Swiss-Prot record:
Family: Belongs to the bacterial ribosomal protein bL9 family.
Function as written in the Swiss-Prot or TrEMBL entry: Binds to the 23S rRNA.
Name of the encoding gene: rplI
One GO location term (cellular component): ribonucleoprotein complex
Pfam families, per database record: Ribosomal_L9_C, Ribosomal_L9_N
Organism: Methylobacterium sp. (strain 4-46)
One BP term from GO: translation
Name the UniProt record assigns to this protein: Large ribosomal subunit protein bL9
Record's keyword terms, sorted: Ribonucleoprotein, Ribosomal protein, RNA-binding, rRNA-binding
Lineage: Bacteria, Pseudomonadati, Pseudomonadota, Alphaproteobacteria, Hyphomicrobiales
HAMAP family reported in the protein's UniProt record: Ribosomal_bL9
MF-aspect GO terms: rRNA binding; structural constituent of ribosome
Amino acid sequence: MEVILLERVAKLGQMGETVKVRPGFARNYLLARGKALRATEANKKRFEDQRAQLEARNLERRTEAQAVAEKLDGQSFVLIRQSGETGVLYGSVSTRDLAEVLTQNGFTVGREQFSLNQPIKTLGLHNVPVVLHPEVEVTVTVNVARSPEEAERQARGESTTVRDELDLEELGLEVGAALAEAGPDAGER
């Protein structure tokens, strides 16, 4: 199905371009969200008549997004979650959680504006891209920690997960002593 794009769509094209897409993508995403029109002769004429208005509206949205981007870019947000000793979360941090945190901090960002490839499942600092407008993208840092104190340590760059560090020489001496006590035939079973 051919559609006329009403705004820039990532990996598809710029505003005003006629592109060929699969019918399901056109119906369920592009047409439903007002990002495109079916490429009929009547719609092509209507688009050309409204092109100046659409470009002005797009420019206005982009300047609003850039104003928000200046405030949001480089910001750091803390999420407190439960996790195991190795730093793996019980559950995950999804785009819904990220949208809630940003909303609580005074930014209006929808969950569809985060471009996470997969949910965050570990403690630590994570850089998350936020698409405020098809032409404006910023990165925020999400600090996932078990407590506010741990979040502060992570922000300073300290490690917070428990790692068992073994001194191999000490371990070797302990194993050797245990074998010596067990007798000469203990290791041959």
